[in-house]
Design a protein with these regions (language model features):
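Bacterial Sec-dependent N-terminal signal peptides
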Residues: 1-25
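Active-site-proximal flexible loops/turns
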Residues: 9, 66, 266
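Outer-membrane beta-barrel porins/channels
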Residues: 20-34, 39, 119-531
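Outer-membrane beta-barrel translocator/receptor signature
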Residues: 37, 49-58, 64-154, 238
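Alpha-helical transmembrane segments and their juxtamembrane interfaces
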Residues: 12-13, 69, 441
Length: 531
């Protein structure tokens, strides 16, 4: 039985909209470098190493280390896996929703690296010995994800929450031709598709198609329903880099990048409810007839593209005795973003004459946001021609992310920017790598982890481990192979908001919370030629 606290829900909904925009900014700002198979196999701990085209986006001075020109291309596969199951709200651990543990996955092909550097020898024995020019494309983020969750529920419903959210909005307005100009699109889709409807003669009070209304005004879920949540995310972020490197006396290596950060992101999710027994969901019509709820499906999709220009500067110092020291700094990126989104909904009853469908228009909006400054340091030690070990530290303060707008949305973005400063802070990233050479072969391994950019986040955030093999011929050809496993932080997802409260505003029937665990395997093969 539900009693609703409308004002509280409106406050929560507004806060959630601001927070979502803040998290979108984080999603588009974070980097999880890929590159060549060699750099990936060694955990991308290349700030002090260089010599590999995968290292150029980490430290621009890396191009100057190799005393030759080279070309590489790296095809790769990503195997993404997710597990989803409900989280119990009770002390005894019982699950009133999403009780089934569901596994899902997807496989994507990509090209995380391609590039070429041209080395010019000045024929000097000291001073400026070599100059390198390069163009490299390296992948810096992968959004691939597939989620599927399913289970039974006998207490709450997506459509009940939607009905509460719609309270106070006139049905005549929700059904108007220009409804999408004045009301939340999700609510308009819900009403026009038949997920919610008015009751009791009211024009601004709603009930879900799976709910029953009693004479005393109580509203309850009619019976058991099967609930399904699905999500599919694709896309990635790439850095297109123009590089200049310089070798000074085989002691100091300098480099600079002009980079273009390019991102594409696609998010598509749906929520579905089906009646276990439609007879439990009897709805009386004004004409004296009855209809029975069978199933509904609600879908939301979102796509974004962004691009921005930045500069990065780096240096590598080789003081001797096998020691190498590297450092790099990257300017903030001013990103121009265009995003598109839309909603659709369908409600089906046992008699198709009552079925309803609705589709929103396609939304489009453009804005700018600034990704923060980054800096990294590295130490490495080489064992002659036998191998190397390396370690990197990278720092990025995500509280410096910022939306910018000169239009009428300035107040909205000011609110989001305040949330960003409150929620996010510095992130510390550590990367470690090792390589051991056996003639023309090389054995490699790496590990990395990062702290959370959220100030109050508890638990592990993100880590990865990797290994690989390399082959270098006596001629110009070389090939590298790498595996990397990425382990991401747990996600707790609520498909709809709490809406059943007692007279004091306490939750009496908790809505579903889904625990989503995610990891992926990456397999890369680099083919390269030196000349």
């Amino acid at each position: 039985m539900r009693k609703t606290a409308i004002t509280f829900l409106l406050m929560v909904t507004a806060a959630a909209a601001y927070a979502q925009s803040a998290y979108d900014c984080l999603l588009f700002s974070e980097s999880n470098y890929e590159g060549t198979a060699r750099s990936v196999a060694m955990g991308n701990a290349f700030t002090a190493l260089g010599g590999d085209l995968g290292s150029i986006t980490i430290n621009p001075a890396g191009s100057a280390v190799a005393g030759y020109s080279q070309f590489t291309i790296t095809p790769g596969l990503t195997f993404s896996a997710s597990t989803a199951q409900g989280v119990s709200p009770f002390a005894d651990g019982s699950l009133p929703y999403f009780e089934r543990k569901m596994k899902s996955g997807m496989t994507t092909f990509n090209l995380p690296n391609m590039g070429m550097t041209l080395n010019w020898d000045t024929n000097r024995t000291s001073g400026l010995k070599n100059i390198t020019f390069g163009f490299v494309v390296n992948k810096s983020a992968d959004f691939s994800q597939d989620v599927y969750a399913n289970g039974l529920n006998s207490t709450t419903t997506f459509m009940g929450a939607m009905a509460v959210d719609a309270a106070g909005l006139p049905a005549s307005g929700l059904n108007a031709n220009d409804a999408y100009s004045y009301y939340p699109w999700s609510t308009v889709v819900g009403y026009q598709s038949g997920m919610i409807s008015t009751f009791g003669g009211y024009d601004d009070e709603y009930v879900g198609a799976s709910e029953l209304v009693f004479d005393n005004g109580d509203i309850v879920l009619g019976g058991d329903i099967d609930q399904t949540y699905g999500r599919r995310v694709t896309g990635g972020k790439f850095d297109y880099v123009f590089n200049l490197g310089a070798n000074v006396s085989d002691f100091l290596y300098l480099g600079a990048n002009i980079g273009i950060s390019s991102l594409d992101y696609s998010y598509d999710d749906y929520f579905k409810e089906s009646a276990i027994d439609p007879a439990d969901f009897e709805i009386a019509l004004d004409n004296g007839k009855y209809m029975y709820f069978n199933q509904m499906k609600y879908r939301y999709w979102y796509e974004a593209e962004s691009s921005g220009v930045y500069a990065k500067f780096g240096a590598i110092l080789t003081p001797g005795y096998g020691l190498r020291i590297g450092a790099a700094v990257q300017t903030p990126i001013v990103n121009n973003v265009t995003e598109w989104w839309g909603y659709s909904g369908s409600t089906e009853f046992t008699s198709s004459e009552y079925d309803g469908y609705a589709y929103s228009p396609e939304g489009e909006y453009s804005y700018n946001f600034v990704s923060p400054f980054r800096a990294n340091l590295g130490l490495a030690y080489t064992f002659g021609k036998f191998g190397v070990i390396s370690a990197d530290y990278e720092y990025c303060d995500y509280s410096q992310m910022k939306f910018t707008s000169s239009g009428g949305d300035r107040d909205y973005f000011d609110e989001v920017n305040n949330i960003i400063k409150d929620v996010f802070g510095p992130q510390n990233i550590w990367r470690f790598g090792a390589e051991f050479k056996l003639g023309t072969l090389a054995l490699r391994g790496g590990y990395g982890f990062s702290t959370s950019p959220e100030r109050h986040f508890e638990g592990p955030y993100r880590s990865n481990f990797s290994f690989g093999l390399g082959y270098s011929s006596n001629g110009s050809f070389f090939a590298d192979f790498a595996f990397r496993k990425n382990i991401y932080s747990n996600e707790y997802y609520m498909p709809y908001s709490d809406y059943i409260f007692d007279d004091e505003g306490n939750i009496t029937e908790p809505v579903p919370e889904i625990l989503i665990t995610r990891s992926d395997w990456k397999v890369l093969l680099t083919l390269g030629w030196r000349f």
